[in-house]
Amino acid sequence: MKVFCGRVNPTTGAMDWVEEDEHYDYHQEIARSSYADMLHDKDRNEKYYQGICAAVRRVKQRGQEAVVLDIGTGTGLLSMMAVTAGADCCYAIEVFKPMSDAAVQIVKANGFSDKIKVINKHSTEVTVGPDGDMKTKANILITELFDTELIGEGALPSYEHAQHNLMQETWEAVPHRATVFAQLVESTRLWSWNKLFPLNLETGDIKPHPELETCPGAPSVCDIQLSQLNPRDFKILSEVLCVFRVDFSCQVSSAPTSHPVHFTSLASGAAQVVLSWWEIDMDPDGSITCTMQPSWMYETQQSVPWRDHWMQCVYFLPKECSVTQGEVCCLTAHQDDYCVWYSLNKSSAENDPVCRERPTCHCGAHITWNRARFGELNDRHRTQQYFEALKKVVTPSSTCLCVSDGSLLPVLAHSLGAKQIYTLESSSIAQHLMKKLFQVNHLGEKIQVLHKSADSLITADFEDRKISTLIGEPFFTTNLLPWHNLYFWYSRTALSTNLAKDCTVLPLSASLHVVAVEFKDLWRIRSPCGMCEGFDVSIMDKMIKNSLNFRESQEAEPHPLWEYPCRALSEPIQVMTFNFTEPVPTEEIRASGSLNLVRSGQCHGAVLWMVYELTKEITVSTGLIGISEEMGECQWYPHRKQGVYFFSSILNPQTIPAQSPSSVSYSVTFIPKEGDIRMCFEPDF
């Protein structure tokens, strides 16, 4: 059955009514899931298998039947491991219906249907008894309920309920325990993702609103591939601290609690950020350990496992705190049932009661700007580029309009002497935030914030003035892919009647660029697995492929590529240009050609990004900013996500051609009516 779904188009700003299959949502969830990534995580799979074998063996040595409960079974992989290890029966719980159906098929295909029962319920709804979902309570608890923060997917409440209701009086658990580690650091780069720094201009400093300075920030964890952070970007202030452990073989509590750890500071500095990760011991002895520690904790880089479903965490302290080398401090990890946060005290005094509450943004900035956007606004080199460009177009007679969400361009325009400045904000929270920022810097009367869309503006909004200078970064909070910021072009088109005949537009244009790449690891998230630890999971591969084909097989997907190393196999090329000095055309813009591969390697996909021509002399890239000559290692703009188009024919180990492609053919079409860019890439052999 088909249904009509209303979606705001991020490029045009219009409400699009799209006819979708009724199962679109779960196809999208499967297509964007990390199931394939987990199946490719050999370190994780091997450690789980070893831990499961050991747990079954311990139960059998006590003369008991091994009854396994597997919560969040996914493909059924861990359940099949348990039965292969000698478990008598296994109850595999999976709440997501399409995944549960796949698990039933995978279990059957591997010949385990007689010992594994897949239950399509949330674990808290499972019943035990002669007529229940489980005939008897289990004595082995196997789970993979963890996220990067360990407890963010509700692991603690699930464990708590299962141990109370679904487990025997004593049980074995795989994993047996989890340990959370933390390290206190000073880092201007990371801190710039959480606070707005003062903006130093020739006419004076622009300071953030005091509310932003005292705001504890966003409640969600910042999870990144910490191994890709340059060690020069932070200063270590503490040893790696063991902050708390969770023993899954004992009764777990999801009640809020705190874990204070005293330490002696290794260096003097500004304590700003806590780097954190966890490890799980699969057995009571701790001889089978799976760790999420970053690469610099390993003796050799060859032994570092790569995974994207579990990364590392960056936590921002509520406020910056100076510490002195040799000073005794107390770092406290606070947790509730789903979240962890940190506070720092410089004495053994009781923690500030406020820190016991989950941090919540009260300034509006952490709701308006995500962490990458904070970093972009604090990027001094980028700001200087825009400042130099604005110098060329802003005059004392300029009436400026800024079309970008939460932008500081109006402040730059004012510092250059513009007569009148207006700025559009798409949300009431952003409008309130920017008004406060302008007011605290005595710019409230000089920069007017308009909470309207471009197509709803009338002459009266500009006090009967014509806009002489239209400016934008452009950046909009609704953007997912690089070309979604072409919303600036659609806004410029809607504003045509409000623009002076000789209106200057900055940027002048945007261009779409592409390069063919070999990823070090990111390709794994879209690569079929086939066999995993001796079990056939190809049904899962087909399920993911079907969901990708359902909608996303011919689409790029957004990834912050500074976290994912890759090599350029072709030279980057410009494939399409969008002229902002003219309205959006009615005719489609088409481009086709080929990327000649100049370096050897597995060509996993193409990366796309936008470059903005601010003036004839100044351009800014939201993607590639450098390539090493010899190996072709790419350096990416860190504040935006790039578009990645994976080549399915090369990602499948079973269909990889014997020879590498010599080039990649492309066809790209911009469809003005839809505000969409359709693309097709084909490796040429």
UniProtKB/Swiss-Prot annotation:
Q: EC number(s) of the enzyme?
A: 2.1.1.321
Task: Give the source's domain of life in one word.
Answer: Eukaryota
Q: Does the keyword Lipoprotein apply?
A: no
Pfam families (alphabetical): PrmA (PF06325), PRMT_C (PF22528)
Q: Indicate the secretion signal residues.
A: none
Q: Which UniProt keywords apply?
A: Chromatin regulator, Cytoplasm, Differentiation, Methyltransferase, Nucleus, Repeat, S-adenosyl-L-methionine, Transcription, Transcription regulation, Transferase
State the reactions this protein catalyses. L-arginyl-[protein] + S-adenosyl-L-methionine = N(omega)-methyl-L-arginyl-[protein] + S-adenosyl-L-homocysteine + H(+)
Q: What's a Gene Ontology MF term here?
A: protein-arginine omega-N monomethyltransferase activity
On whether Repeat is a keyword of this UniProt record, the answer is: yes
Q: List the catalytic residues.
A: E144, E153
Predominant cellular place of this UniProt entry's protein: cytoplasm
Q: Where in the cell is it found?
A: Cytoplasm, Cytosol; Nucleus
Gene Ontology CC: cytosol; nucleus
**One GO process term, biological-process aspect:** regulation of DNA-templated transcription
Domain SAM-dependent MTase PRMT-type span(s) in chain numbering: 14-341, 353-680
Q: What class of enzyme is it?
A: transferase
Q: Which family is annotated? A: Belongs to the class I-like SAM-binding methyltransferase superfamily. Protein arginine N-methyltransferase family. PRMT7 subfamily.
Q: What is this protein called?
A: Protein arginine N-methyltransferase 7
Q: Which organism is it from?
A: Xenopus laevis
Organism lineage reads as: Eukaryota, Metazoa, Chordata, Craniata, Vertebrata
Q: Which gene encodes it?
A: prmt7
